[in-house]
């Protein structure tokens, strides 16, 4: 009789345990799927992202839709009209997951507010919205099995220059409270620190790698009391990977980008990697970066293997 009672209790507990496990497990977060920026002049931004950087434009579902440029089959840059009065031109960052439904359940179980329901784009991409503790807008997206299915526009393909890059390595934004951001990105989402550094004795940058890929989010640490509106385009940024920074710079010099921002020469950053800072028409930094360091980083060693 006792054995029977134990078996019944075990059978009863198992479904509840499995249900709880399904709710609490985080699905994989594999990388950056999209970076979205605001623009005050869509035509100028089209010249920058399409003609200068060479990214083909994805065919829009409607004339009012934001412009989207394909970096690879799984990554893109979106440009949308800037809201009136905005001083921050980084609209949002989208992270890819393999199971959006499980991600929604997981976020809810962790008491992370999910904005609305899961939505689906014409190409089959599914997405949901959240905000981090400092109010940065984030998307989690589940791409179709073969990446973006929407074709690039025919006008974009014709006489298109060679894309400057085929990968978004990282994106970064201003962070005032690292502890709060770590509770969200590290404790809940599983991001892992790969490197940190800064000028002098001041910690300024922290690279937080996605848990199931090689892309990373860069905390641009700032004093909570400081006003950074004038520097937001420099701090809120994204980086494109290139195998050879000097070849990339030479390619861009032949394209004669007419920008109000000064052209910067390639330099080795404090992380030991060659980089080149470019700026779109609204001052958002589009950083070109080589994949690996050519010298020892300034301040702290890499704590994770450097992605190749």
Give each language-model segment a name.
Residues 75-77, 83, 119, 215-219, ...:
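Intrinsic, low-complexity N-terminal interaction/targeting segments
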Residues 50, 54, 99, 108-113, ...:
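Sec-exported extracytoplasmic/periplasmic mature domains
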Residues 21-27, 30-40, 67-70, 82-167, 173, 195-199, ...:
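Vicinal oxygen chelate
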Residues 179-182, 186-268:
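Structured core of small recognition/catalytic domains
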Residues 27-76, 172-217, 274:
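Core segments of cupin and vicinal oxygen chelate
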Residues 6-17:
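Bacterial N-terminal signal peptides
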Residues 1-5:
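Positively charged n-region of N-terminal signal peptides that target proteins for export
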